[in-house]
């Protein structure tokens, strides 16, 4: 994997050894009063043994562990971490290092942004999804019940360390979840990158690192042009309007098998692409190809008519809605997204019929 640093909005994204140097140099220069490492039950066991030996500092260090998984990305967990920081002696000169997937980096960034009106933090994404998605853009926060990401602020870390050694700690389904966002970046921004992702199974394993960096570059360029999501940045929500609703539905209904974020977004992308055919004249053959490519990585899920109705109701709570309207990102062509598309609800049912066929 290339080690060229990527300049983001007021911070940088460092790769592998450069990330280690960045963290050690920053701690030596700033001399925070105390270090806090936020981990979950998985990264405490699997990722800290990779991270800690490279941390060169004599500054006091505390580890705060939260339970892993999306169901714990909520205000109750934030409160637990705020209390832990307070009881362990954190002050405004402390530094929080968030080591984990998107739940840890999103929630940890929000905790840091609000504790004592804001302390410094660094993100160390350990899942593929967090590396290519949560590493860029400064979005922090948590869920409100089963409603995704309704609470939060935009606040940038001091820096991000992407270390591909952590990928070896991930189960296969977590790797696939991250690939969904990589496929998305190609579909909304780069036909060439989409074609590379289509050939992923034929590429040598070490090439994944190149694709990760390119995915970060794509998202970073979108965020750089539109940091507050007034226009272009909305394109990153492709597949997410229905994807988030599907993910929320599974969280609300534990009798259903839980879907990871990327798994739900992959379904959302198939649905959004079919809606693009219906609403914008996107080529049906290309839609079928996108569906087939994603089906190689994401097994088809079943949905009853009643479940589809419930999912559509959840979609009304999407934080991107305005004035009661549900807005979609659709495709005019691969690499040519269109934002703020209003779609008739009956078309959404037809999209599910297409997905299930």
State where each predicted segment sits.
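ATP/NTP phosphate-donor binding region
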Residues: 1-94
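Catalytic, metal-anchored helix/loop core of enzyme active sites in primary metabolism
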Residues: 9, 225, 250, 348-357
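Generic secondary-structure signature for well-ordered alpha-helical cores
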Residues: 90, 156-159, 165-172, 180-192, ...
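Short glycine/serine/threonine-rich phosphate/pyrophosphate-binding segments
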Residues: 103-110, 131, 244-245
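A glycine/threonine-rich phosphate-anchoring loop and its flanking beta-alpha core
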Residues: 110-200
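C-terminal charged capping/lid subdomain of soluble metabolic enzymes
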Residues: 180-182, 284-357
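Active-site segments that bind and position negatively charged phosphate/pyrophosphate groups
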Residues: 196-309
């Amino acid at each position: 994997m290339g080690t060229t640093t990527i300049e983001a909005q007021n911070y940088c994204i460092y790769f592998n050894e450069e990330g280690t140097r960045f963290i050690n140099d920053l701690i030596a220069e700033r001399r925070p009063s105390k270090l806090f490492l936020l981990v979950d039950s998985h990264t405490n066991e699997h990722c800290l043994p990779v991270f800690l030996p490279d941390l060169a500092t004599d500054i006091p260090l505390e580890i705060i562990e939260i339970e892993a998984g999306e169901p714990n990305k909520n205000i109750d967990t934030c409160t637990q971490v705020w209390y832990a920081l307070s009881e362990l002696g954190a002050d405004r000169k402390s530094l929080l290092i968030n080591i984990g997937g998107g739940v840890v980096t999103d929630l940890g960034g929000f905790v840091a942004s609000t504790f004592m009106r804001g302390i410094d933090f660094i993100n160390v994404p350990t899942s593929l999804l967090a590396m290519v998605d949560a590493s860029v853009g400064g979005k922090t926060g948590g869920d409100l019940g089963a409603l995704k990401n309704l609470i939060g602020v935009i606040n940038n870390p001091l820096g991000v360390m992407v270390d591909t050694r952590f990928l070896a700690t991930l189960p296969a389904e977590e790797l696939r979840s991250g690939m969904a966002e990589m496929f998305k970046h190609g579909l909304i921004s780069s036909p060439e990158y989409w074609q590379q992702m289509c050939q992923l199974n034929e590429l040598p394993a070490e090439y994944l690192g190149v694709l990760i960096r390119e995915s970060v570059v794509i998202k970073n360029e979108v965020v750089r042009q539109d940091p507050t999501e007034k226009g272009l940045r909305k394109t990153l929500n492709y597949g997410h309007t229905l994807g988030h609703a599907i993910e929320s539905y599974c969280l609300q209904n534990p009798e259903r098998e839980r879907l990871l974020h990327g798994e739900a977004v992959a379904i959302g992308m198939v649905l959004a692409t079919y809606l693009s055919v219906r609403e914008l004249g996107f080529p049906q053959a290309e839609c079928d190809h996108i569906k087939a490519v994603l089906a190689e990585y994401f097994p088809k899920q079943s949905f009853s008519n009643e479940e589809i109705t419930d999912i559509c109701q959840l979609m009304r709570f999407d934080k991107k809605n305005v004035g009661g309207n549900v807005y979609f990102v659709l495709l005019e062509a691969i690499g040519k997204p269109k934002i703020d598309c209003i779609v008739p609800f009956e078309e959404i049912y037809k999209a599910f019929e297409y997905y299930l066929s």
